[in-house]
């Protein structure tokens, strides 16, 4: 969990920018989006397979 303590003489925008950087670095938002909806194991395998095929197709170019 990202935690930011606002420093003395620091603007709120700067603190918010540091918080956003911390959240993206931790991967908190990605984890939330991943767990937002339940994905059945069969669908997850299919998506993973399709992503691998797409990666391999890109590498072959």
Swiss-Prot record:
> What cellular component terms from Gene Ontology apply here?
ribonucleoprotein complex; ribosome
Whether Ribonucleoprotein counts among this entry's keywords is: yes
- Family annotation (Gene3D superfamilies): Ribosomal protein S8 (1.20.5.1150)
One GO molecular function term of this record is: structural constituent of ribosome
Entry superkingdom: Bacteria
Keywords, sorted A to Z:
Ribonucleoprotein, Ribosomal protein
Q: Name a biological process GO annotation.
A: translation
One Pfam assignment: Ribosomal_S21
NCBIfam families in the cross-refs: S21p
Q: Which family does it belong to?
A: Belongs to the bacterial ribosomal protein bS21 family.
Question: HAMAP family annotated for this entry?
Answer: Ribosomal_bS21
Name this polypeptide is given: Small ribosomal subunit protein bS21
């Amino acid at each position: 969990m990202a935690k930011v303590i606002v420093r003395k003489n620091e603007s709120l925008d700067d603190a918010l920018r540091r918080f956003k950087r911390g959240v993206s670095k931790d991967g908190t938002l990605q984890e939330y989006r991943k767990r937002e909806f339940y994905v059945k194991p069969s669908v997850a395998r299919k998506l993973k397979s399709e992503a691998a095929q797409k990666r391999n197709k890109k590498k072959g170019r």
